[in-house]
């Protein structure tokens, strides 16, 4: 048996590799995104990251009419969110929630890649962000 046949047989037994989900939404987040998209009559919400704040990165959310060539599409609980390519490595595995109480009404991101965030919670840092900062020094 050739090596390629052995590998093919092993792959067939194991099945496809599980891919970590880019983004998951709580019911509250999905409900709020659905409301916002209906209100603006837009098909997508686009999630990105922007360099700002004392810890390096901040999340951005914008309405979108179409999927960009390299955007990652997340369809969950009846809503569609596009993740910008440059944000992908910083947000993979993140859970998006929505908090609405007497003090605030905002989306909250529970990010397993976060290596720290500033005191006010406006910005965060991932391993990729901290590596880039150290390289620039």
From Swiss-Prot:
Presequence boundaries: 1-33
Protein name in UniProt: Iron-sulfur assembly protein IscA-like 1, mitochondrial
Primary location recorded for the protein, binned into one broad class: mitochondrion
Keywords assigned by UniProt, alphabetized: Iron, Iron-sulfur, Metal-binding, Mitochondrion, Transit peptide
GO cellular component: mitochondrion
Role according to the record: Involved in the assembly of mitochondrial iron-sulfur proteins. Probably involved in the binding of an intermediate of Fe/S cluster assembly.
Subunit annotation: Homodimer; may form tetramers and higher multimers.
Binding residues for Fe cation: 54, 118, 120
InterPro entries xrefs: Fe-S_cluster_asmbl/transfer, FeS_biogenesis, FeS_cluster_insertion, FeS_cluster_insertion_CS, HesB-like_dom_sf
PANTHER family named among the record's database cross-references: IRON-SULFUR CLUSTER ASSEMBLY 1 HOMOLOG, MITOCHONDRIAL, IRON-SULFUR CLUSTER ASSEMBLY PROTEIN
Family under the similarity heading: Belongs to the HesB/IscA family.
Gene Ontology process terms (BP): iron-sulfur cluster assembly
Cofactor mode of binding and number, as noted: Binds 2 iron ions per dimer. The dimer may bind additional iron ions.
Superkingdom of source: Eukaryota
């Amino acid at each position: 048996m050739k090596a390629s046949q052995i590998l093919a047989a092993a792959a067939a037994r194991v099945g496809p590799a599980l891919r970590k989900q880019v983004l998951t939404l709580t019911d509250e987040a999905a409900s709020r995104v659905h409301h916002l998209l209906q209100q603006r009559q837009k098909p997508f919400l686009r999630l990105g990251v922007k360099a700002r704040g004392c810890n390096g990165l901040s999340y951005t959310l914008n309405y979108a009419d179409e999927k960009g060539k390299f955007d990652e599409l997340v369809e969950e609980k009846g809503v569609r969110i596009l993740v910008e390519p440059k944000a992908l490595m910083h947000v993979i595995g993140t859970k998006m929630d929505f908090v609405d109480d007497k003090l605030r009404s905002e989306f909250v991101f529970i990010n397993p890649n976060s290596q720290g965030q500033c005191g006010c919670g406006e910005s965060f840092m991932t391993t990729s962000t901290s590596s880039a900062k150290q390289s620039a020094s």
